[in-house]
């Protein structure tokens, strides 16, 4: 994940991923070196999804651009989290070992269905 000036993946890993999710990031302008490696990943077959109300220069390279309404990205994030939980894709061992308040978080996203997020975003 790349965001405010840093990331959790190496440039080499970005070149070898299957999917790239840019959420609120115009990496092409803000992180040009990272974007150079991202482009190698796209050339290697990665699919890119861009989530941003703006049609940025980065989003023009995306396979899918989700142009959410300004201020609705939290609803989208909560709906995605709810789907991950409902699909059983949560790493329960990691959560038990490394987090606090998960049950409260899980309850807080329960009302954010995909239908709700689609309607407001």
Map each language-model feature to its residues.
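Cofactor-pocket helix-loop regions in the catalytic cores of large enzyme subunits
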Residues: 1-121
